[in-house]
Design a protein with these regions (language model features):
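Helix-to-loop junction immediately C-terminal to a conserved catalytic motif
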Residues: 48
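Conserved ABC ATPase "signature" region
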Residues: 96, 100-103, 108-126
C-alpha cells in the first residue's frame, strides 16, 4: 500500500504544487489525470523519490520512501509523460541497462526479461533500432516496457 500523508510541495518561487495531499493507493496499475498545473508531475516525482516534498510523509508498505528511496524504486514502475532516453541507444540495450538499474543482476534473467517485454509491447522486430528512429507510439510502448521491468508492485 502506498500512503501519502499531508504531502505538500512548494517550489522556490513560492508556487504551491501540492497542498496537504493525503491518500492511500493499493498495489496495481494507475493513471493520474488532471488539468495543467494541478501538480500531477510533482506528485509523481515525489512518489518516485526524484524530488523531496516540502513536508508530509510517503510510505510504501510501511517503509519511509524518502529515508529508503531504493525500497520503492525497485518496486515502482513509472512512466512519465516525457521520459528521457538516450536516442542513439537501441531499444534492447536501453531496456537491458534499465533492468540492471532495477536490480536484475543475472544476465540470463535480464535477457529473458528484456526479450519478453519487447515481445509484449510489439517492438521485438525493431529491438536493434535506435530509439531516436521510433515513432511517437513506439516510444510510448518502449516506455511501457521500461515501466514493467522487474514486475513492479505499483505502476
Amino acid at each position: 500500500m502506498l500512503t501519502l500523508t499531508d504531502v505538500t510541495h512548494v517550489y522556490p518561487n513560492n508556487t504551491r504544487a501540492l497542498d496537504g495531499v493525503t491518500l492511500e493507493i493499493p498495489r496495481g496499475m494507475y493513471g493520474l489525470l488532471g488539468p495543467n498545473g494541478a501538480g500531477k508531475s510533482t506528485l509523481m516525482r515525489s512518489i518516485a523519490t526524484l524530488q523531496t516534498p516540502s513536508s508530509g510523509a510517503i510510505t510504501f508498505d510501511g517503509i519511509d520512501v524518502m529515508a529508503e528511496p531504493e525500497a520503492i524504486r525497485a518496486r515502482l514502475g513509472y512512466l512519465p509523460q516525457d521520459f528521457g532516453v538516450y536516442p542513439r541507444v537501441t531499444a534492447y540495450d536501453m531496456l537491458e541497462h534499465m533492468a540492471v538499474l532495477k536490480g536484475i543482476a543475472g544476465s540470463a534473467e535480464r535477457k529473458e526479461t528484456v526479450e519478453t517485454l519487447l515481445n509484449q509491447v510489439n517492438l521485438w522486430k525493431v529491438r536493434k533500432k535506435a530509439i531516436a528512429g521510433f515513432s511517437g507510439g513506439m516510444r510510448q510502448r518502449f516506455g511501457i516496457a521500461q515501466a514493467l521491468i522487474g514486475n513492479p508492485d505499483l505502476i
